[in-house]
Amino acid sequence: MAIGSLSSLGLGSKVLNYDVIDKLKDADEKALIAPLDKKMEQNVEKQKALVEIKTLLSALKGPVKTLSDYSTYISRKSNVTGDALSASVGVGVPIQDIKVDVQNLAQGDINELGAKFSSRDDIFSQVDTTLKFYTQNKDYAVNIKAGMTLGDVAQSITDATNGEVMGIVMKTGGNDPYQLMVNTKNTGEDNRVYFGSHLQSTLTNKNALSLGVDGSGKSEVSLNLKGADGNMHEVPIMLELPESASIKQKNTAIQKAMEQALENDPNFKNLIANGDISIDTLHGGESLIINDRRGGNIEVKGSKAKELGFLQTTTQESDLLKSSRTIKEGKLEGVVSLNGQKLDLSALTKESNTSEENTDAIIQAINAKEGLSAFKNAEGKLVINSKTGMLTIKGEDALGKASLKDLGLNAGMVQSYEASQNTLFMSKNLQKASDSAFTYNGVSITRPTNEVNDVISGVNITLEQTTEPNKPAIISVSRDNQAIIDSLTEFVKAYNELIPKLDEDTRYDADTKIAGIFNGVGDIRAIRSSLNNVFSYSVHTDNGVESLMKYGLSLDDKGVMSLDEAKLSSALNSNPKATQDFFYGSDSKDMGGREIHQEGIFSKFNQVIANLIDGGNAKLKIYEDSLDRDAKSLTKDKENAQELLKTRYNIMAERFAAYDSQISKANQKFNSVQMMIDQAAAKKN
């Protein structure tokens, strides 16, 4: 105790010093603090041991919970013959054999677009143009600027479609090995990419269809398309369909009738053959699409065109160029040219002109030029079209070059899709997007993907290749007992790890008087007996006595549990319903017709464990909380005892110091008197 050093008290006495105080304090600490420390150590040991027991019980609860779950007993597994598909099955699927004939796999659209290049950094186009295509019920127009590289164009396609259609630069080999590919991310016929122009129908007419000529001799339905000679040609369509035909059947018949009519016309025969013009059904046959990948106009003519579902009977032409801004007001200077035809801006505009007046004057001048037309759109901006689909814009002098900006135009060449198709957008379809087609136990089915999970609930199929005729893939669905076997194996392991720990912590040796840390805790001492009581549970049925021993579980004389897996498998295979009833439970009706559920043995195990560790009112949780409270109380008691001793011995030290001072003064006085006595004695001598 580092308070200081006291001299002895009393004449010649060395009793009152700090060594004495420390000895007194040590004695008090042994009497007050040491018992508290011992209790705190025991509390920590109990909390640690309790955590271990709860952990072991949680490990036991895992397999018990599985074995008390109904889904465990209706678990299924599948086996597939052949390589055409893979399959997985969920719980409760009826045990059966499923025959699957795979005619077609779903696939995405793969297209080559444009010429080949020596590098992905080569310039794709020297002109401004627009790539037009349609897929997934949406039209896309990808703006391509002069000077963009092959890689830039590929990325622009991907970005414009949010990755639904991917522009890919592929190295295919040769002197110019790089090729732009336009592919769809997803499979299915609705993911087909249609370049150029298209018309689409949505047929709802359930009546009979008769397509021929009307009273005036005109075709009731005809197709008006650009032929191989570049001119528009009209082709009549003839067809008779009964009322009984479905929408899909009608669209398929219309498709074939249109294709046949075009194939029979020399203007279109080769265009149908090479895919420049195509007619397809979409959306499971609910819709029909006519496509001209050259970008030409498509028109469905005749009095019955709308009866075929063509609400829009002609394609809408896209404008070639829209200015980036409204034309500047006031007088504009300089000369500009459109396709070589000059416009003198100073002659067309005045200082007092508004933007609208300048726009009207310039539009009038453009419309007077050969092959050009212009108008003002709803935004007040200049729109220019060219009969050839090509427009070259140029500033003819310095003022004209500067004034292009005031017109919202840029110098250069602009081409329509149709004008660019033969040079930039020549496309070749390498793989046509299509649905998968297969039969499921004889029923014909189509799906947009090869992942099929909606034919029968719980059966998931992945189509991988087509099957040979009359050699279907067979999915055999059978009972899966492995989860039961695995859970029982885990149950035995967890039980055999828990029991030795319980024995150790609750033991009592009468000879040595040594007791386990939980020897006096009834809730923990009762765990083993509670589990063993459930283990010994049996029930009489029509099939005899049901007990865990029947399923290969047993306890030896040392309390070690074992599992005879062969015996378990035999019992599971011979009567799975009896296993389910004994392990999980069974349902029946009482005399009044009410449903009652008889709990199985593992439901009983689950309840025993839940009462111990689940929730705030679980027995071990309550005991754990009591240990926490005891720990806090002991800590507080120790702090109070330490504070008491500190105060007591601080006061004692202060008093000893005062006594020491008084005795020191008395000693000094005594020494003075002694000196006087000694001096007097010396004089006498």
From Swiss-Prot:
Keywords noted in UniProt: Bacterial flagellum, Coiled coil, Secreted
Coiled-coil region list: 618-647
Entry's Gene Ontology BP terms: bacterial-type flagellum-dependent cell motility; bacterial-type flagellum-dependent swarming motility; cell adhesion
Domain of life: Bacteria
Mutagenesis / variant outcome for changing residue 193 to I: In strain: KCTC 0217BP
Subcellular localization(s) per the UniProt record: Secreted; Bacterial flagellum
Pfam families referenced in this protein's UniProt entry, alphabetically: Flagellin_IN, FliD_C, FliD_N
Impact when changing residue 86 to N: In strain: KCTC 0217BP
GO cellular component: bacterial-type flagellum; bacterial-type flagellum filament cap; bacterial-type flagellum hook; extracellular region
InterPro entries from the UniProt entry: Flagellin_hook_IN_motif, FliD, FliD_C, FliD_N
Disulfide bonds: none
Result for mutant: residue 231 to S: In strain: KCTC 0217BP
Subunit structure: Homopentamer.
Entry's family note: Belongs to the FliD family.
Role description: Required for the morphogenesis and for the elongation of the flagellar filament by facilitating polymerization of the flagellin monomers at the tip of growing filament. Forms a capping structure, which prevents flagellin subunits (transported through the central channel of the flagellum) from leaking out without polymerization at the distal end. Essential to colonize and establish infection in gastric mucosa as a result of its essential role in motility. Has effect on flaA gene transcription.
Protein name (Swiss-Prot/TrEMBL): Flagellar hook-associated protein 2
